[in-house]
């Protein structure tokens, strides 16, 4: 029955989520002073002014823009719950697609000799090129150092692995005291239990297509697929038969949420 449900969910006549009564949870922006803005409730206009930065919201995208000069740096935190997603254009023009159940902490403006953000969960980054100021994504297991490139980071705290997938450019990944070079079409995987690291060639669309609103699974375990869907649609999965977790599926289509 579970397999039939999954098949209907991905390949049925109606798109996923179209008539299932799924409502996107609140997406919140925490300002430096601790105040929280519920972005789902905010009209598309200027949200606030932070020092010399103007923050606006449109089409599920926050945009930070310079409106003056200041040495003041403040940190904002963008948080999505299960079923939610949001994008942010940082002060340097870097665009970040934040997936469900994820948190991104970042400065309202970048000063100093690097651009650093902190991620828990999953995000896709399109980093503005700056050879003099590397962009660094920090997770609990990896530091990803780039200067201008596109890549996906999957760093959920309750997952068994942390994965960074490079679409184009080049990245340096600092992990377990070592630095690893990752090239386009490669993925670096950190196994949390064994502390092991591997770099392998992958189909990047399997890991990055979500940011364009599509899913793609290729010979993927049912448990892994349903774990992903549970985040996208804020549902809990209960297995009456544990053996079905190992069944594998190949499917692709549009995400509607």
State where each predicted segment sits:
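A residue-level detector for the "anchor" residue at the start of short, highly conserved motifs
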Residues: 5-257
């Amino acid at each position: 029955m579970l397999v039939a449900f999954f098949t209907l969910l991905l390949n049925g006549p109606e798109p996923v989520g179209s008539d299932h009564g799924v409502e996107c949870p609140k997406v919140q922006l925490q300002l430096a002073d601790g105040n929280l803005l519920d972005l789902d409730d905010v009209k598309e206009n200027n949200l606030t002014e932070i020092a010399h930065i103007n923050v606006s919201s449109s089409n599920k995208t926050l945009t930070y823009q310079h409106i003056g000069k200041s040495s003041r740096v403040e940190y904002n935190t963008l948080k999505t719950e299960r079923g939610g997603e949001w994008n942010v254009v940082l002060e340097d023009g870097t665009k970040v697609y934040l997936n469900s159940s994820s948190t991104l902490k970042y400065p309202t403006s970048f000063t100093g000799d690097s651009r650093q953000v902190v991620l828990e969960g999953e995000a896709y980054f399109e980093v503005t090129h700056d050879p003099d100021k590397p962009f660094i994504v920090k997770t609990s297991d990896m530091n990803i150092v780039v200067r201008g490139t596109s890549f996906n980071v999957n760093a959920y705290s309750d997952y068994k692995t942390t994965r960074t997938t490079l679409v184009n450019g080049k990245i340096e990944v600092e992990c377990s005291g070592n630095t690893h070079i990752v090239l386009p079409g490669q993925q670096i995987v950190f196994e949390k239990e064994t502390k092991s690291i591997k770099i392998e060639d992958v189909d990047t669309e399997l890991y990055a297509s979500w940011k364009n609103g599509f899913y793609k699974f290729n010979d993927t375990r049912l448990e892994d697929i349903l774990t992903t869907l549970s985040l996208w649609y804020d549902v809990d999965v209960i297995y009456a038969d544990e053996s079905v977790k190992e069944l594998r599926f190949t499917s692709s289509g549009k995400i509607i949420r």
